[in-house]
Design a protein with these regions (language model features):
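Active-site-proximal, Lys/Arg-enriched surface segment
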Residues: 67-162, 277, 281-282, 292-296
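Single, function-defining residue in the core of a domain
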Residues: 1-18, 106, 110-111, 145-150, ...
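Short, amphipathic alpha-helical "recognition" segments used to contact nucleic acids or chromatin
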Residues: 29-39
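Electropositive nucleic-acid engagement tracts
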Residues: 39-116, 193, 212, 217, ...
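Non-membrane alpha-helical secondary structure
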Residues: 3, 7, 24-25, 56, ...
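Structural motif
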Residues: 18-28, 125-131
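Short gly/ser-rich anion-binding loops that grip negatively charged ligand groups
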Residues: 37, 54, 72, 92, ...
Length: 314
């Protein structure tokens, strides 16, 4: 419990010294404890039940739900305090961060950040257009007991342009509509913030193919420089190009940006499979042998040299 006290006090210090601030500070700490205690799943109704049953806190349901849906919590200060509490964030000399977007379904109609969103991953018994919050989140990847774990470092609410143009109540903070930003812009802001907080650590963002393009790469690379890299999945139909040849003396015109067309990632996989080598990697908590081949090529989605790794099943 002393460890929890030392972790929670720096977080509580960011709340104001008013009656409301002290109430929120205490409620914030106890809510975190309710999440940690293996009592039940961490949905809002179960957290309220934990506060009442385990900690004896008397609070009205509407009051607690208002607190949980608050748009004025000092998240930026809280997140930076959390970053400072991580004892050894680096893995082999660099920060590994996962980047993705997700949705958080809700029921209340006036909850901040909510709108009708298309869920491309909806199951057969789920609505494809749930009423939910759309989040872009970044988390720190660390190995815990031989398996990879993700510790959230930051998040942003994403609003569709039509929601902001309509000035919906769920897109307002203190009566002011939030400015529109794309998911890539939100992700770039978070990565730049993390890079500034850890000014000497190389930063590797692990993401899917949707975020792996120059709209994220270029602005973050411009600020963080060579410290920033992206590891993303590659679409099977992505076209690969060889690196351009060096300019010859007396050659007219500018140097070519791309070399010859090599084909799609799938076509290249068939050609390089015989050249694959066996590597031992830690996969799902065990050291396993994996066949892989890599090559440096050019991609028009990033407009720069990219190392592509093909991993083959045995």
């Amino acid at each position: 419990m002393f460890i929890l006290r030392d972790l929670l006090r720096p977080l509580q210090a960011h709340f104001s010294d008013t009656d409301l601030g002290r109430e929120r500070s205490s409620l914030f700490a106890y809510t975190l404890l309710a999440v940690i205690v293996p009592f039940t799943s961490s949905i809002t109704s179960n957290l309220l039940r934990s506060l009442v049953t385990l900690f004896g806190i008397e609070i009205k349901k509407k009051r607690f739900y208002t607190f949980m849906a608050s748009s004025t919590l000092p998240w930026q200060k809280l997140w930076q305090t959390v970053w400072g509490l991580i004892p050894s964030p680096e893995t082999e000399g660099r920060l590994l961060v996962a980047l993705d977007d997700c949705i958080n379904p809700k029921i209340g109609k006036n909850i901040f950040g909510c709108e009708t969103i298309f869920d491309h991953a909806a199951k057969a018994n789920q609505s494809q257009y749930p009423w939910a919050q759309n989040l872009v989140a970044v988390g720190l990847l660390k190995q815990v007991k031989g398996r990879w774990a993700c510790l959230f470092l930051d998040f942003r609410f994403y609003f569709a342009k039509k929601t902001i143009d309509a000035e919906k109540v769920t897109a307002k903070i203190k009566g002011v509509v939030v400015p529109f930003q794309t998911k890539l812009e939100l992700a770039g802001q978070m990565l730049i913030g993390i890079g500034h907080y850890f000014p000497t650590s190389p930063l590797l963002a692990v993401t899917d193919s949707w975020f792996g393009n120059q709209s994220l790469w270029r602005p973050v690379r411009k600020v963080l420089g060579d410290r920033f890299h992206i590891l993303s999945r590659l679409r099977c139909n992505s076209v690969l190009y060889a690196q351009p040849d060096a300019s010859q003396p007396g050659q007219r015109g500018r140097r070519r940006k791309y070399g010859k067309r090599l084909g799609s990632a799938t076509q290249m996989a068939a050609e390089v499979r015989q050249k694959a080598k066996t590597y031992t990697v830690n996969l799902y908590g065990k050291d396993r042998d994996v066949c892989a081949y890599d090559a440096v090529v050019m991609l028009k989605t990033l407009k720069c040299p990219v190392r592509v790794v093909w991993v083959f099943r045995k």
